[in-house]
C-alpha cells in the first residue's frame, strides 16, 4: 500500500533530521528513511567527529603504565564511546518521534519523481509518495 506524505527525507544526518523535525512541527506529514538504525544522527555522531574526539580525549587521559593497564584502559574507553554514541543516536531518534516524524528503516530507491520504494532489512517493500523528496546522504 502506498503511504502518502508531504515530505520524504532520505538520510538521518544533521541536515535531514533538522529539516524533517522542523517541517513536522509546522504541520507537514514527514517520513525520514535511514537504511541503518545504527546511523541515526549521521556520520558525525556515530563514526566521525564525536566518537573520534572522545577516543582522542581518553587517549590523552590514559595512564602511562605497562601495556596490560593501557589495554584495559583502551577497552573501557571504547565502551564509553559506544555508550555516548548510543545515547546520542537515541536522543536524535526521540526528537524526531516527538516532532511527529515517521522514521522508516530501509534502503530507499526512486520509483518515479514522487514515489520512493523502501526495502526493509528482511526484504519487505514499502511504497511512499510525497510532493517533496529530499536526498540527505
Stretches found by the model and what they are:
Residues 1-13:
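Beta1/beta-strand and adjacent pyrophosphate-binding region of the FAD-binding site
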Residues 10, 33-34:
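The conserved SAM/SAH-binding core of class I Rossmann-like methyltransferase domains
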Residues 16-17:
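N-terminal Rossmann-fold NAD(P) dinucleotide-binding loop
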Residues 2-5, 22-28, 34-137:
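Glycine-rich flavin
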Amino acid at each position: 500500500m502506498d503511504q502518502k506524505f508531504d515530505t520524504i527525507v532520505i538520510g538521518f544526518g544533521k541536515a535531514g533530521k533538522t529539516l524533517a523535525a522542523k517541517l513536522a512541527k509546522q504541520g507537514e506529514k514527514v517520513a525520514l528513511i535511514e537504511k541503518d538504525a545504527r546511523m541515526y544522527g549521521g556520520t558525525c555522531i556515530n563514526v566521525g567527529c564525536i566518537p573520534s574526539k572522545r577516543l582522542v580525549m581518553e587517549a590523552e587521559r590514559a595512564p602511562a603504565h605497562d601495556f596490560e593497564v593501557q589495554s584495559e584502559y583502551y577497552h573501557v574507553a571504547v565502551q564509553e564511546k559506544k555508550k555516548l554514541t548510543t545515547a546520542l543516536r537515541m536522543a536524535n531518534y526521540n526528537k524526531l518521534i516527538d516532532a511527529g516524524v515517521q522514521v522508516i528503516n530501509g534502503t530507499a530507491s526512486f520509483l518515479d519523481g514522487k514515489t520512493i520504494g523502501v526495502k526493509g532489512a528482511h526484504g519487505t517493500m514499502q511504497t511512499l509518495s510525497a510532493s517533496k523528496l529530499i536526498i540527505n546522504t
